[in-house]
């Protein structure tokens, strides 16, 4: 047993989609979350800068004595997850492999779409993982750089959001039966994405799939929080506006949360 919290990092609020799933599947675990909204989105940034920013988030979580770190950010996973995983002596999980595996299990036609930030798509990491696991799969990748700013500005339900999603996804419509939401911000746009793609296209939430791996590793390393420890103290940190973070989180998480501003 290990009552230390699980650390989550993201470029902003998108990783809350992963935290929500953790709270649903593993409600006894405690969360510490850091979202770097002040420097979001990470996707258009150079790899070197993404690496620097991500290490700052990792080091922040380490000061909080976490027992595991979850990269709730596809861009950071694509750029620096392997490096961090090799250097730390606690488990470090990313969202890309779980999402890739789920897409392969879901598809019937073998036609899979990937949407993500420019850096995630440029890295080809989803395509590589999918083809490593199942070489016969046909993968279509599409960068959607306008999606993260919509979410970070809390305009998910606006007419502008609907227009941008429709225009962005049109190259994939009618060509795939499975679509990986390759950015943890994107599930916040899920209803619009589903409407554009149609009811027959299965949407894969890579962050939600990651939580299943968290559960496996907690069991494997005997890191589960004691079920007799009833008091949970979830802590959330943002590098930008606390009010904006709370507003988005209130629509997404099943409880009121404590949020603090932090400067990295």
Swiss-Prot record:
It catalyses: L-glutamate = D-glutamate. The keyword Cell wall biogenesis/degradation applies. InterPro entries: Asp/Glu/hydantoin_racemase (IPR015942), Asp/Glu_race (IPR001920), Asp/Glu_racemase_AS_2 (IPR033134), Glu_race (IPR004391). Pfam families: Asp_Glu_race. Pathway: Cell wall biogenesis; peptidoglycan biosynthesis. Its EC number is 5.1.1.3. NCBIfam families: glut_race, PRK00865.1-3. Belongs to the aspartate/glutamate racemases family. This is Glutamate racemase. It comes from Streptococcus mutans serotype c (strain ATCC 700610 / UA159). The lineage of its organism: Bacteria, Bacillati, Bacillota, Bacilli, Lactobacillales. The gene is murI.
